[in-house]
């Protein structure tokens, strides 16, 4: 690879072709360079703080509310405010920043499209550059796509509001280096989206809106507040022009929701229940605690007390501060089989009804075919209102740390373990092949599901847990099942698809991250090394 330097501070390893030159303009690169040099050292300190915090929990401590910040939790204050075009978010659709998906999502019967550079995108260089071009074209109203049959996809006149989800603090952008280290992917995504689109967004009465993933502390939220304020000052924009919704999808963050809202109060408009990553984080954070091992992932549903407490506390905290409380993802995919489709819709409706009844202001779907059914539930719940900010849940008893940490009963089954293996291997294979959003067994899977699958098995091995049939989960048992399930995958997909894919590499990575002595933080980190 040729090293191409287009900035005094940053080095780019990829040749700057026609696509790159549209996005990596000299002024855009200068802005990115300023952000990287100013904010990367503190980002590195924040990642080091995560390691120290986890070491304390591994040694026996449990996450808890922070005594030093009690005054923030107990005093009365609210966030700065919510822009008009974000006051109604009853249904949001999520998906990667691929051209056809961007058009279909913006045209769906939803209020918001969360365009994703994170868990549903495998961030190869071409995908992140194309993603920036696609969002720029969508905002300018010029995006179109033609399929092989000649069908043209274009935006309808009144598309959904666009929110951009950037990569988490831990993810690097390896194709750009600063001082011989990959720059933060989060700053790469933020800088280029903001730089190219802020003027057009403001001109049409919207703004630069972001979703922030994987936050673990209020200090990380404060870092984002500084990044946003720097960008606003650099472009002579009023404070609070940039707005963010932050995902509460890690166990440490659930104890710091007031503090996170307070640290980002100029810019934040809401929090979101990132339920699948939250379950993954629960397993990962409490991995050394044998009394907090979860059962099969299929039985860990939002009705379980520890997850219901998380949802209720998020709603109560957000609405007290004037912020939105967004519900979690419905990962189901509609089916062409009418009986299966009825089952899917009933599952989704029950889940979304519970969220609406709890007081959520809106919710997430992964497929436009669910939009009408979910919209209908929230239309009825809102009854003419735009949101449920008035639902304060003041009558609720306080949610305690013990409730948030309480494991849930349930079986660990051989079928569940085998299903975990098949889903994780197929997802990893797709991800390292460049596809981060994958339909598997009727669910639209992203990285969170594979993370739950592999961390569950790691923890069962680590604590020598037994399956319901009496078998102890060991590395040897896992390796045996992995070999057997690879044959099942081959049979399900067919020899041609299997041989053309990267299933052997995916199985090796699954084996490595599931049997390692120490639990690897995110499968996307070793996975990224296998991505172009």
Tell me what each language-model feature is.
Residues 2-532:
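Expand to "…catalyze enediolate/carbanion chemistry for C-C bond making/breaking, isomerization
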């Amino acid at each position: 690879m040729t090293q191409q330097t287009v900035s005094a501070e940053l080095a780019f390893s990829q040749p700057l072709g026609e696509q790159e030159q549209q996005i990596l303009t000299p002024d855009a690169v200068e802005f990115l360079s300023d952000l990287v040099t100013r904010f990367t050292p503190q980002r590195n300190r924040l990642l080091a703080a995560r390691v120290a915090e986890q070491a304390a929990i591994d040694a026996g401590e449990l996450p808890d509310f922070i005594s030093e910040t009690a005054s923030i939790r107990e005093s009365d204050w609210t966030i700065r405010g919510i822009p008009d075009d974000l006051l109604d978010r009853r249904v949001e659709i999520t998906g990667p920043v691929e051209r056809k998906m961007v058009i279909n999502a913006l045209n769906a019967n939803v209020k918001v499209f969360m365009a994703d550079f994170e868990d549903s995108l495998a961030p190869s260089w071409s995908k992140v550059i194309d993603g920036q071009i696609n969002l720029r074209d969508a905002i300018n109203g010029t995006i179109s796509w033609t399929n092989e049959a000649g069908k043209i996809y274009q935006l309808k006149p009144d598309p959904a509001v666009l929110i951009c989800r950037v990569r988490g603090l831990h993810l690097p952008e390896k194709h750009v280096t600063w001082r011989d280290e990959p720059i933060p992917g989060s700053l790469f995504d933020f800088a280029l989206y903001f730089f190219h689109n802020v003027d057009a967004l403001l001109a049409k009465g919207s703004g630069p809106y972001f979703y922030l993933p994987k936050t673990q502390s209020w200090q990380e939220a404060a870092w984002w507040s500084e990044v946003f304020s720097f960008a606003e000052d650099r472009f002579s924009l009023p404070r609070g022009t940039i707005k963010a919704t932050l995902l509460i999808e890690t166990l440490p963050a659930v104890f710091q929701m007031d503090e996170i809202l307070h640290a980002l109060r100029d810019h934040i408009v809401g929090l979101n229940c990132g339920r699948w990553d939250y379950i993954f984080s629960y397993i990962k954070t409490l991995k050394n605690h044998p009394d907090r091992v979860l059962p099969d992932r299929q039985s860990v549903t939002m009705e379980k007390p520890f997850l219901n407490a998380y949802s209720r506390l998020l709603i109560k905290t957000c609405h007290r501060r004037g912020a939105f409380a967004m519900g979690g993802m419905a990962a189901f995919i509609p089916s062409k089989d009418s009986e299966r489709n009825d089952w899917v819709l009933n599952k989704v409706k029950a889940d979304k009804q519970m969220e609406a009844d709890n007081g959520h202001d809106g919710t997430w779907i992964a497929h436009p075919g669910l939009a009408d059914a979910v919209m209908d539930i929230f239309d009825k719940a809102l009854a003419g209102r735009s949101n449920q900010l008035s639902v304060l849940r003041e009558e609720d008893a306080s949610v305690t740390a013990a409730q948030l940490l309480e494991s849930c009963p349930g079986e660990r089954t051989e079928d569940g373990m085998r299903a975990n293996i098949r889903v994780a291997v197929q997802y990893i294979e797709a991800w390292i092949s460049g596809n981060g959003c994958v339909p598997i067994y009727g669910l639209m899977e992203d990285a969170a599901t594979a993370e739950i699958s592999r961390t569950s098995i790691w923890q069962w091995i680590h604590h020598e847990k037994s399956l319901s049939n009496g078998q102890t989960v060991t590395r040897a048992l896992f390796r045996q099942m992995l070999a057997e399930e690879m044959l099942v995958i081959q049979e399900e997909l067919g020899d041609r698809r299997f041989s053309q894919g990267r299933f052997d590499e995916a199985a090796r990575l699954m084996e490595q991250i599931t049997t390692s002595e120490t639990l690897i933080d995110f499968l996307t980190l070793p996975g990224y090394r296998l991505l172009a």
